[in-house]
Amino acid sequence: MSEFNNVSVVKEANIYFDGKVTSRTVIFPDGSRKTLGVMLPGEYTFNTGSAELMEILSGEMTVVLPGSPDPVAIKGGEAFEVPENASFKVNVTAVSDYICSFL
């Protein structure tokens, strides 16, 4: 799906890591939400409150997921899941466009 229809968008941006990671929140009619964002090259650690599905639309990164010491290479067209109340690290090597779905 290349677009979302009949949604609300929160005007205020979510800005993290001195502006190197930004996103906008999209709210669907059923109350579910996603964020659409961009990550610039760099290393970042994120903490989750709820489980997340991270879909990488374009770009490249390595990800260290909870319970795994080894990084996994992720590129545009791929996705990964993170459990609730967890922490994960990303090393973004090319500007990355992403969708984060809260599960």
UniProtKB/Swiss-Prot annotation:
Keywords: Glycosyltransferase, Transferase. InterPro entries: Ppnp, RmlC-like_jellyroll, RmlC_Cupin_sf. Pfam families: Ppnp. One of its GO terms (molecular function) is guanosine phosphorylase activity. One of its GO terms (cellular component) is cytosol. CDD domains: cupin_PpnP-like. It catalyses: a purine D-ribonucleoside + phosphate = a purine nucleobase + alpha-D-ribose 1-phosphate; adenosine + phosphate = alpha-D-ribose 1-phosphate + adenine; cytidine + phosphate = cytosine + alpha-D-ribose 1-phosphate; guanosine + phosphate = alpha-D-ribose 1-phosphate + guanine. It comes from the Bacteria. Its EC number is 2.4.2.1, 2.4.2.2. Belongs to the nucleoside phosphorylase PpnP family. Catalyzes the phosphorolysis of diverse nucleosides, yielding D-ribose 1-phosphate and the respective free bases. Can use uridine, adenosine, guanosine, cytidine, thymidine, inosine and xanthosine as substrates. Also catalyzes the reverse reactions. HAMAP family: Nucleos_phosphorylase_PpnP. This is Pyrimidine/purine nucleoside phosphorylase.
